Curated annotation (Swiss-Prot):
Protein name per the record: Sodium/potassium-transporting ATPase subunit beta
Cysteine pairings via disulfide bonds: 145-157, 168-182, 233-290
Organism: Artemia franciscana
UniProt-annotated location(s): Cell membrane
The organism's place on the tree of life at top rank: Eukaryota
């Protein structure tokens, strides 16, 4: 076999670059004056491009956001009544609510007596009613209303917390210490106007008999008090009806219609009805269902329309 030529023995035998040398060459190439693969002019062009691009993008976003905010009214909801998520029915709610850690619960459970654990519920109700106690009726937006004295336009009716009586007060621990707990029911929906029953003949067949009788007495005694969204609360099942005992409603057996509609008048506070359970049995949980009654309120237990549910247990 012929010997290789002397020059061929040294082809490709030069020293190889190390990884560090290769990296340094990428960062700065002195032969081409490139920094990380680009010349100074190339870096200037791409920097100017992205500055202009992101400036235009931010300006477009700001412009769209400004146009969007022009469509909003921070005092009036865009979707109301039947167009809203909750529909045309007003919402019923109750207080006190269970702790935030039990967000899915509707159970009010406590041990009454001096050594009881009722303090949380009393504190919760005290906090809820604090705005009612601190707000006076001397403001320009407020007026004292009555069944024959509706509010003036642009003003809200003042709800006097003293109407809740002597039993459902923080001084009396809202009845929890004595085993006669109070629960507050509220009814509200923006822009909703109640269509009340003008006579006892208009009430539905499924209205509880005791409320029907009460409305008849009101109609006979003082018909102006018919201007009311009525409220009924009772045990949800036959067994609950037996265990629930007596319920006292204050200040009314419902919500005076002159408090509605709610139109976001500054300082408006929704009216409440205080329920006092006077004869609960120890260790017995009771399912309570409250319903609101008016011509334009639909009631459906499955969808919780026109009603609110909670449980109460005293130990």
């Amino acid at each position: 076999m012929a010997d290789k030529k002397p020059d061929e023995q040294f082809v490709g035998s030069g020293p190889k670059e190390t990884k560090w040398q290769s990296f340094k060459g990428f960062v700065w190439n002195s032969e081409t004056s490139q920094f990380m693969g680009r010349t100074a002019g190339s870096w200037a062009k791409i920097t100017i491009f992205y500055v202009i691009f992101y400036t235009l993008l931010a300006g477009f976003f700001a412009g769209m956001l400004m146009i969007f905010y022009q469509t909003l009214d921070f005092k009036i909801p865009k979707w109301q009544n039947k167009d809203s998520l909750i529909g045309a029915n007003p919402g019923l709610g109750f207080r006190p609510m269970p702790p935030e850690a039990q967000v899915d619960s509707t159970l009010i459970q406590f041990k009454h007596g001096i050594k009881g654990d009722w303090q949380y519920w009393v504190h919760s109700l005290t906090e809820f009613l604090e705005p009612y106690e601190t707000l006076t009726s001397s403001g320009q937006e407020f007026t004292n209303c009555d069944f024959d004295k509706p509010p003036q336009e642009g003003k809200a009716c003042n709800f006097n917390v003293e109407l809740l009586g002597d039993h459902c007060t923080k001084e009396n621990n809202f009845g929890y210490e004595l085993g006669k707990p109070c629960v507050l029911i509220k009814l509200t929906d923006f822009g909703w106007r109640p269509e009340v029953y003008n006579s006892s003949a208009e009430v539905p067949e499924d209205m509880p008999a005791d409320l029907k009788s009460y409305i008849k007495d009101i109609e006979t005694g003082n018909k102006t008090h018919m201007n009311m969204v009525w409220l009924s609360c009772e045990g949800e099942t036959a067994n609950d009806k037996e265990k629930i005992g007596t319920i006292t409603y204050t200040p009314f057996r419902g919500f005076p219609a002159y408090y509605y509609p709610y139109l976001n008048v500054p300082g408006y506070l929704t009216p409440v009805v205080a329920l006092q359970f006077g004869s609960l049995q120890n260790g017995q949980a009771v399912n309570v269902e409250c319903k609101a009654w008016a011509n334009n309120i639909s009631r459906d237990r499955q969808r919780r329309l026109g009603s609110v549910h909670f449980e109460i247990r005293m130990d």
